[in-house]
Amino acid sequence: MGMRYRALHSWDVRPDEAVEIQKMLAGSVRFQRVDRVETVAGADVSFSGSRAHAAAVLLDYHDMRLLDVSFAEMDVVYPYIPGLLTFREGPVILRALEGIDEADVLLFDGQGIAHPRRFGEASHLGLLLDRPSIGCAKSRLWGEFREPDGERGSFSLLVDRGEVVGAALRTRTNVRPVFVSPGHMSDLSSAIEIALNCARGYRVPEPLRLAHILSLKRARMTR
């Protein structure tokens, strides 16, 4: 049984309409502790021209053993617009996730609520899938932070106008932090704990690292 999602809106919308969709749906995001995690999924997209190649992986949360993998591809015409990444990558990611078993928590290479409208890719896709989700981005989109201490596990809060929206998390000692934020049905402490547990010797958590490698390999095969 693959992961299923709810079609809450059209993907064929103008950027201004996409912004309004984000504003409308952001109020549906829920925050809660993520407990009893046995499996974790990650998804990433690589491009070959206008063709998007997505990989979704399902891993054992405890030993990061690969349990399932699925691929999807489609032509993408939606432009790259910061803050509207889901409208470019979301459809192909959802198609890839349909091919793997349901995970207890989902990791996305993007923002959760660390977003101008508190509705980044992890929040958006988590809401559509109705599953706990976490954003773990390699770069900051929104909010201010101070550099965390150099040790693995150190973090500093990501703050926007007095509101905590995420954290800069050091997943490897003396390596640049990643930017973690709750997506949907998660909270910041869970997001930090899960992202750190999934980072096994690399800066990027293993589900996202593996999904990136596999999607990039697929994209290169078509060039």
Swiss-Prot record:
Superkingdom classification of source: Archaea
UniProt KW keywords: Cytoplasm, DNA damage, DNA repair, Endonuclease, Hydrolase, Magnesium, Metal-binding, Nuclease
Main localization of the protein described in the UniProt heading: cytoplasm
Gene3D superfamilies tied to this protein: archaeoglobus fulgidus dsm 4304 superfamily (3.30.2170.10)
Protein's UniProt keywords contain DNA damage: yes
Site note Interaction with target DNA, residues: Y80
Annotated signal sequence range: none
rRNA-binding listed as a keyword: no
Subcellular location: Cytoplasm
EC number: 3.1.21.7
GO molecular function per UniProt: deoxyribonuclease V activity; magnesium ion binding; RNA endonuclease activity, producing 5'-phosphomonoesters; single-stranded RNA binding
Enzyme class: hydrolase
Positions bound to Mg(2+): D44, D109
Entries under Pfam families matching the protein: Endonuclease_5
Cofactor(s) named in the record: Mg(2+)
One GO BP annotation of this record: DNA repair
Gene Ontology cellular component terms for the protein in this record: cytoplasm
InterPro entries found in the cross-reference section: Endonuclease-V
Reaction(s) catalysed (UniProt annotation): Endonucleolytic cleavage at apurinic or apyrimidinic sites to products with a 5'-phosphate
Function: DNA repair enzyme involved in the repair of deaminated bases. Selectively cleaves double-stranded DNA at the second phosphodiester bond 3' to a deoxyinosine leaving behind the intact lesion on the nicked DNA.
Protein family (similarity comment): Belongs to the endonuclease V family.
HAMAP family linked to this entry: Endonuclease_5
Protein known as: Endonuclease V
Taxonomic path: Archaea, Methanobacteriati, Methanobacteriota, Stenosarchaea group, Methanomicrobia
